């Protein structure tokens, strides 16, 4: 069966079918509300750091440190959510993160020392590190397995609206104060915590049969799984470089916060359009999932290099457009492939590891932008992209025919 076909017809029909499920629509809305603070994080942290210290570089450190915390916590948190009531645990974790983000807002307004700002950013990220994986676990209990790929495709498109709304919301509220973006993140995170409790019934999430217990003992790690984690890492690094650099790139072009937001909106709009086309037409695309992923990784790098030229608006816009066109299709490809490579009973742990790998990529992007000159930082992903693309040629790392 193709990635985008099911036993009852083509993907277009399955997209309509999954959208007709009330439980999926509730999950979709809740998932976006949970993700919205993540979309707000880069610009909100940069502006909070600028308001507190007068320099955006502390924001890069906060982003890198928070992403590193997610890497360390995502897998253990995923295991916890796998073995407990995912809804209740995710809700409490989100409430805790909302409190910490509120404290970070106050700390930024009072210009607390940078180490404390970084510490609060790390704590908030640690609390929410496993929640995206938990939401994926809840999705698996919300839609039939045959509708999972269409559900992911729709989700991948809708995510881009969140990517657009996040920076726009930050830009709107920072007119009040530079720390208002993080304050809005706190409020939205608290609202997401409340909505998570109204999702799939607990028995769909926590019931554990003897067969599930046995499945937990199955191996999780395999060479193809490691390869796809690497693909997720490199993709996140390239996307992160484009997103986090939007504000300094806008400044080099003579613009400001609004210019940065518009660049991010362009990226997100391109990603949403590409994701929609990919969800409906990927069955007609040539090559395997791995081959398509490699092509999109190369496309991401081309876009980032164009951004790095800082040669005026045309090349910068082209760079953000190319990055956007590759983003949603690549994310959908990675998630759907990881889903098939792991035992179902360890899905949340696997998605936690995927979150961790993308967190590493995002941390590398934030660290590069904090420590290196802007142009050097932007081309830093060339090395990791080259290594990842070369690794895909190794026979031992390739999935079997039924997994591509």
PLM regions and their residue ranges:
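Helix-to-loop junctions at the C-terminal end of transmembrane segments
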Residues: 70-86, 174, 273-289, 373
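Hydrophobic core of transmembrane alpha-helices in multi-pass small-molecule transporters
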Residues: 32, 113-130, 233, 315-329
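Helix-loop boundary and gating motifs at the non-cytosolic
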Residues: 9-71, 219-265
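A late C-terminal transmembrane helix in Major Facilitator Superfamily
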Residues: 345-374
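Intracellular juxtamembrane helix-capping segments at the cytosolic ends
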Residues: 45, 129-143, 246, 329-342
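Cytoplasmic helix-loop-helix junction between adjacent transmembrane helices
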Residues: 120-161
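C-terminal transmembrane helical hairpin of 12-TM major facilitator-type secondary transporters
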Residues: 288-332
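C-terminal ends and interior cores of transmembrane alpha-helices
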Residues: 95-111, 298-311
